[in-house]
Amino acid sequence: MDPLGSFMTQITRFVPIFAILFGLGTFGLNAAISQEGAAKGAGSIEDKSPFETLPGMQPSGNMLLPNGWTINAQGRQAPLGDFPVHLLVHPDGNNLIVLHCGYGEHEIITLDAKTLNKIARVPVPQSFYGLALSNDGAWIVASGGEDERVYAFPYNKGYLGEPVVHTLATKTDKFVVSGVGLSKDDTEFYACGLLGNQVKRGKRPFGAMEKPGVSPTETLQLPDDSYPYTVLEDAANQRLFVSLWGRSAIGVVDLKTFQLVATWKTQSHPTEMIYLDDTNRLLVACSDENSVVALDATTGELQEVLLTALYPAAKNGSTPSAICVSADRRVLVAVNSCNNNIALFDISEPKKSRSLGYIPVGWYPTNVKFTVSGDQIIVTNGKGLSSKDNRYGPNPLKPAPKNVTEYIGGLLQGSLSAIPTPTPEELATMTRLAFQGAPLRKDSVVVDAERSPNNPVPAKVGDPSPIKHCIYIIKENRTYDQLFGDVAKGNGDPGLCIFGENVTPNHHALVNQFVLLDNFYVDGEVSADGHEWTMAAYATDFVEKTWPLTYGKSRGKLTYPAEGATKIGQPSSGYLWGKCKEAGKSYFSFGEFIANGRNPGDPSRAKIEVLEGHFDPNYRSYDLDYSDLDRAASFIKRLKQFEEAGELPNFITMHLPNDHTAGTRVGKLTPTAMVAQNDAALGLVIEAITKSKFWPEVAVFVIQDD
């Protein structure tokens, strides 16, 4: 066999959602779990409509995720910890080293490369992506994240000793160590400051500090919003490459002066880099653009763009966030984090690279490396191999100590895939599996299976429809069973229903009169990625990599990354409002992606540019001390103004958040009271819409963010 030779448990439903098409009659608007992924073939759901298929283990042995993707990870699988983000292969070929930076324990895990058995687990107080090995393999250097540290661990056959600690900033500084690196002779170390927009260079990386305090370093200041991700040294030319995650560029640093001498344009969100000195190319993963770019390493000129998505015309969202090359530098591998596969390319001839195929791996792959011998491809999967329910979570009837597995942030533990480097024939088979496991369509047309003749939803863009206005209501955090487990016609669990019809009569009246979607799921785990998926059908790698820290081990430096809070968190493909603008449709937001004024009554402001002039400044966004009934009143007041003007925006978003509840906090409304309040507010909103002049041409969709 000549690898690549010829060409070189049950799922918890996260969301109660119903759709109402007002004035258009009642019909079954089914929620499709899968589209193309339901086609016949290996890794698919045979002979069943996707509308009838539940996520979880399928007869084929594959795992259907709630988002419609099928996990059919190739090779051997091994469990890891919480959100593995960076992988190294020890130069002796015997061990694998994995850094974890999730909601739970931050740690370095070492594994035997042959058996995949764990050798050691070493906790790190906090980290963020950065991991490097000394040239002799005797030291591991790791990021300390918001603790502003770089750790240097002595390493011996899979075991780590007590680290040498370099403190790079004070506790109040906002440097935040991300990527780290070592000089070729191991006498210096480099550290990126994600929030400080800086790179620091220090000496004696493995030597203990002579006195306590901040270590002496040289500091390079980068432009604002650079968000330096990692570094790569070109020792022969005395240069340091820095991937500027937030500026779509590579910074080139002169190591003699430690000054920025050039900035080379890339595509959006450059992350990992590989320098090929034999062909003078710099390869850069661009995670927000479905691409890996090849730059001339002398001039920075763009030589070619390698598209990693399954389909050439696919919209952004594949998330190629990490890359590696084979020892002979002929094959490039890129992880497609959001496609649950890796893409392989023949890069043997500059400017003439070509796709070789795809290999299915686990859920949200984050890093990839070839083994030293080249006989295996190793992949870390950030979210493991399946979705899970929190069966060990809180139960009001059975008090128990808090457990990290009770919360979604720590529920999806990572995994490792070890794939024998395939032959061309094996890769062709794996490529077919990758396509069969994807809920994508080559032409992106609407699935028209089981459509009734009077379906008002257009089969394709441009077809006529009586729907002229869509109102999209986003609520917070409730599961299907919590609200609708008591609905007999739905596939729910009454034992999990805590806000049933006695608490939510309006929700129940709506799903009984109109449409109940009991097999519909959201892609977000928490509000941070949830609102991004809700409004963009995508959460960037910046959001995915930072929210676990902000929700878990944050020291208060990294902040909420989503809903327009950061420019880098916004996908380059934009949000639904931007798509409306491109299509010449009017749009308006009540509270979604809106920043509140300091006090109720103070005007709010738009968080993103596209919403400027397209929102109600008197509608208060997320604030659990503010009543949803007041939000409903604010909407109704504006609706009357729309009626007086005779025009209703084509697309309206509304944040109705108080079903989030304040838990059992002292002095707050009880969860039951808050959900009941939210139910009453929704009823008032729907009543106002149905009594308005726009009613015959309106469709309303209600969804949970996560």
Named regions from a protein language model:
Residues I33-N454:
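Predominantly soluble domains enriched in secretory-pathway, periplasmic, or organellar proteins
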Residues P3, P16, T70-Q74, V214, ...:
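A short, polar/charged loop/turn motif at coil->beta-strand junctions and beta-hairpin connectors
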Residues D2-F18:
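Bacterial N-terminal signal peptides that target proteins for export
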